[in-house]
Design a protein with these regions (language model features):
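Short beta-strand->loop
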Residues: 32-35, 102-108, 119-126, 135-137, 143-144, 152, 221-222, ...
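Early extracytoplasmic/lumenal segment of secretory-pathway proteins
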Residues: 25-94
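A bilobed periplasmic-binding-protein/Venus flytrap-type ligand-binding module shared by bacterial periplasmic
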Residues: 134-139, 179, 252-264, 283-284
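Ligand-binding pocket segment of bilobal, Venus flytrap-like solute-binding proteins
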Residues: 170-247
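Extracellular/periplasmic bilobal clamshell ligand-binding domains
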Residues: 301-336
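Mature extracytoplasmic/periplasmic domains
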Residues: 259-315
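A structural signal for short loop-to-beta-strand junctions that line the ligand-binding cleft
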Residues: 79-84, 102-134, 152, 161-165
Length: 336
């Protein structure tokens, strides 16, 4: 009997082989961001310079923090975004709790201190933010008012109708402020403060950037805004000053994350690597002058360590149930 092995080998060699299919090329990158449009132009130019091939595939959708993250949650079953870029860390913490994010440790993220990163790498922080008073010098002089120096000052009747703030249900800045005052005063006293402050407000805006822009243009003498936005407006010639409240500064930081179920995960990871790089951080600093989570990039603004920052528990502030409760009560009391 002839051995069967040579025959089997011959038959195997005659069977046509089909190579394993190569992974499908990712031809898109969709980014959801809460950065303002004017600063995005600067950041995007740096991105195109550093990663032109990826930038050619990329697009971003810009919105205020609240609606942007609500959209991510609404799309959970069929994600349309690959990356979240420049969103307040409390919202990112909430998104991680809801299962909306995928862990990814971006290259160079080791240069970011641990307190500015999620312990399971759900997000990494990049830009630090502080809330201050945007005071239009010309307008406040015309009204013969002195600029407020503290949160307590804003309750003075002389400022009635001269203050603009934003809505915490749509603005990350406003929610940050709400949670910060809760931490500073305790919830009961915080609501008493907001009830008194509401009497002096002329307008409550949807966008957190609007109060600063309105102060810069002279539509209001006082806007409660992110300090870096006021500094940018001042550099561009607006008659505006930044005043940090003496009785405590609300602060947070923005971060980036990979969306769970992203359709273009490899492109997303390349972008996230870039977004914490020294080149990207330098572009953030060039526009904002604000402090960064990386300490190896110089900034023109004040150092966080030199400021009277409100002690805030970001995990608590980012808890969806806590946030929903505060925002719901604010809407019940102050919705216009």
């Amino acid at each position: 009997m002839r051995p069967l092995l040579p025959l089997v080998l011959a038959l195997v060699l005659l069977v046509p082989t089909t190579p394993w299919p190569a992974p499908a090329a990712e031809d898109k990158l969709v980014i959801y961001t809460a950065y303002e449009e004017n600063e995005l132009k600067t950041f995007w130019e740096q991105f195109k310079k550093d990663l032109p091939d990826l930038a050619g595939k990329a697009s971003y959708i810009r919105g205020s923090t609240g609606p942007t993250m609500a959209r991510v949650e609404a799309e959970k079953a069929n994600p349309q975004a690959d990356v979240i870029w420049g969103v307040f860390n409390d919202y990112l913490t909430g998104a991680a709790t809801k299962g909306l994010l995928e862990p990814y440790a971006a290259q160079e993220s080791q240069a970011i201190p641990a307190r500015f990163k999620h312990p399971e790498n759900m997000w990494q922080g990049v830009t630090l933010l502080t809330v201050a008073f945007a005071v239009n010098q010309k307008k406040i002089t015309e009204l013969r008012l002195t600029p407020p120096q503290s949160w307590a000052d804003l309750l003075d009747p002389k400022y009635k109708g001269h203050i603009v703030m934003s809505n915490p249900s749509t603005s990350g800045t406003a929610y940050l402020l709400l949670a910060s005052h809760a931490a500073r005063l305790g919830e009961d006293k915080m609501w008493q403060y907001y009830e008194a402050l509401d009497k002096n407000l002329s307008q409550v805006t949807k966008s957190g950037g609007a109060p600063g822009r309105m102060a810069a243009s002279g539509e209001t003498p006082i806007g409660v805004a992110l300090a870096y936005e006021v500094e940018v407006a001042k550099r561009q010639g607006a008659p505006i000053d930044v005043i940090y409240p003496a009785d405590g500064i609300a602060w947070t930081f923005e971060g980036n994350a990979l969306v769970k179920g992203a359709k273009n995960p490899q492109n997303a990871k390349r972008f996230l690597d870039w977004a914490v790089s020294k080149a990207a951080m330098t572009s953030y600093a060039a526009w904002r002058g604000a402090a960064l989570t990386r300490t190896d990039v110089s900034v023109s603004g004040p150092k966080i360590s030199e400021m009277n920052l409100i002690a805030i528990d970001f995990v608590k502030a980012g808890d969806p149930a806590y946030k929903d409760r505060l925002v719901k009560r604010w809407l019940e009391k102050f919705s216009r």
